[in-house]
Structure formats: structure tokens, C-alpha cells
């Protein structure tokens, strides 16, 4: 009997040790290597849609206090360690300096020391306009029509941006299309959303983003749905009823999509 109890206790200890090891490995991966994020807004549409689930690499820019999951509100250190310089066109997850409780995802356009301006929707970097060509239209899932543009930055990075199509000849959001001049300070960066008319970015409330606030570089979409399923405000019965339409809303074509693929 005692022998059986000893064997049982040993098995429980082994299983607990294995479970603890797996949890530790998962935490190390999330803190230092790769972290999943859910995108709740359409500011990067149509590169990234609402309810896209993305993976970002934590090591791409080194590590700062804000990039360490679960420890980001503890002042462990200042600056970045193992820092690597970001590049124009990177899609970056970061904490906005005006609200450190949330995470933003935007495209990096301006580097420290740059002069940035938008004139008639065209980006000018250090008084030189980037290449920008209209390549078609995009109709969102909400039925809203966008003009689709292919843009190429000075480093050769190419991507698509989107602008609301004119309605009855009226062009929307002129304050987004024509801006003042922005001089990017040292150690800070200028960001834009690919959805140019519907993005809270460096043109308006966001301002410049310190390098220290970078969390990681967005790499690919690993899952995507048209609607959300989990909601803390609804009961278990409603969650069960919502499960089927949630499964049916999965965007299969977006699963494992590379965010830097411009062949589409």
C-alpha cells in the first residue's frame, strides 16, 4: 500500500514538474521571442483587418521595459538592450506615449532626423515624394469603397495603402491628406496607418513614438474572423449560441498570411 502511494506521489510530482516546465517555456517564448495580438480596429485596413490575430517577433528591435510581457508596467530598466534599428515600412506593435495602457499597430514611415509631410495624400520624406500608384479599388466587408495605392519607400519597401473613395466627387478628411511639416526627433519615429483616412497616427493625436515604446515587429496573421466570439458582458448561453456564426466567419484566406507580401 505504501509502495503504491509512493509511486503515485512520484507520478504526480513528475507530471507537475513537466507541466511547470511547459509553462516556463511558453512564458519565455511569449516574453522574449514571439507574442500574439488581436487587432480590434481598422486603422491598418486592408493590410490588417479587424479581428485579425497576428504574431509579432519580440527580438526584432531588442528589448525594452515595455516589450516584456507581464512586466511592462514594472520599471525594470530604461532604454533598450540588444537594440536593432527598425526599417521604413516595418509594421510595428508599440505603446502610444499618450496612453500606455493600450497597444497600437502602425507602419513605420519616418526615422529620427527625417522631415515628413503629406501633400494631396502623397508622402514626402526629406522633400522627396515617394512612389505612389493607384492600382485599383477595395470594397470592405462593411461595403465601404476604398481606392488602393501601391507605395514604395526610399529603402525599396513596397506596400498598399487605402483611401476612402470620393462620394459624389467629394474627397474626405483633407486634414489627413494635407499636413504640416513634421521633424522627427532623435530616438523617435513617425507612423501612419495604411487606412489613411481612418487612422489615429502620427499626423494627428499620436505624435512621435519613442523607440523605447516598441513591443515587436508584426510578421504574419495566424487566424482571422469577421466577428468576435468572446464577450465578458454576455452570458454562457449567448456565447454558445454565438459559437456557430463565429466559426462560420473565419477568414480562411487570411490564415498564415505574410504581412509583407504585396503580390495580392
Swiss-Prot record:
Cytoplasmic side: 1-18
GO MF entries: serine-type endopeptidase activity
Cellular compartments per GO CC: plasma membrane
One Pfam family linked to the record: Peptidase_S26
Catalytic residue positions: 43, 106
Gene3D superfamilies: Umud Fragment, subunit A
Membrane topology: Single-pass type II membrane protein
Transmembrane segments: 19-39
Record localization: Cell inner membrane
Gene Ontology terms: biological process: signal peptide processing
InterPro entries the UniProt entry points to: LexA/Signal_pep-like_sf, Pept_S26A_signal_pept_1, Pept_S26A_signal_pept_1_CS, Pept_S26A_signal_pept_1_Lys-AS, Peptidase_S26
Reactions performed catalytically: Cleavage of hydrophobic, N-terminal signal or leader sequences from secreted and periplasmic proteins
Enzyme Commission code(s) on record: 3.4.21.89
Location, primary (coarse class): membrane
Periplasmic-side positions: 40-264
Protein's UniProt keywords contain Cell inner membrane: yes
Keywords noted in UniProt: Cell inner membrane, Cell membrane, Hydrolase, Membrane, Transmembrane, Transmembrane helix
Function of the protein: Complements E.coli mutants temperature-sensitive for LepB function.
Similarity-based family: Belongs to the peptidase S26 family.
Protein name as it appears in the record: Signal peptidase I
Amino acid at each position: 500500500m505504501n509502495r503504491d502511494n509512493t509511486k503515485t506521489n512520484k507520478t504526480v510530482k513528475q507530471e507537475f514538474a513537466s507541466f511547470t516546465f511547459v509553462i516556463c517555456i511558453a512564458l519565455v517564448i511569449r516574453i522574449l521571442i514571439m507574442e500574439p495580438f488581436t487587432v480590434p480596429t481598422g486603422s491598418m485596413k486592408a493590410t490588417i483587418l479587424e479581428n485579425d490575430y497576428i504574431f509579432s517577433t519580440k527580438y526584432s528591435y531588442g528589448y525594452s521595459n515595455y516589450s516584456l510581457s507581464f512586466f511592462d508596467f514594472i520599471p525594470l530598466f530604461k532604454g533598450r538592450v540588444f537594440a536593432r534599428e527598425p526599417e521604413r515600412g516595418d509594421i510595428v506593435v508599440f505603446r502610444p506615449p499618450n496612453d500606455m495602457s493600450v497597444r497600437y499597430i502602425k507602419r513605420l514611415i519616418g526615422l529620427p532626423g527625417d522631415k515628413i509631410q503629406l501633400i494631396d495624400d502623397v508622402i514626402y520624406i526629406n522633400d522627396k515624394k515617394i512612389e505612389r500608384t493607384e492600382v485599383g479599388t477595395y470594397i470592405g466587408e462593411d461595403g465601404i469603397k476604398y481606392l488602393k495605392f501601391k507605395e514604395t519607400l526610399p529603402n525599396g519597401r513596397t506596400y498598399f495603402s487605402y483611401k476612402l473613395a470620393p462620394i459624389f466627387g467629394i474627397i474626405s478628411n483633407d486634414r489627413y491628406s494635407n499636413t504640416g511639416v513634421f521633424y522627427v526627433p532623435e530616438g523617435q519615429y513617425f507612423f501612419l496607418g495604411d487606412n489613411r483616412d481612418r487612422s489615429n497616427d502620427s499626423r494627428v493625436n499620436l505624435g512621435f513614438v519613442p523607440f523605447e515604446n516598441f513591443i515587436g515587429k508584426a510578421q504574419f496573421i495566424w487566424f482571422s474572423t469577421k466577428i468576435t466570439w468572446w464577450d465578458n458582458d454576455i452570458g454562457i448561453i449567448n456565447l454558445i449560441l454565438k459559437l456557430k456564426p463565429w466559426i462560420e466567419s473565419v477568414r480562411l484566406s487570411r490564415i498564415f498570411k505574410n504581412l509583407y507580401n504585396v503580390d495580392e
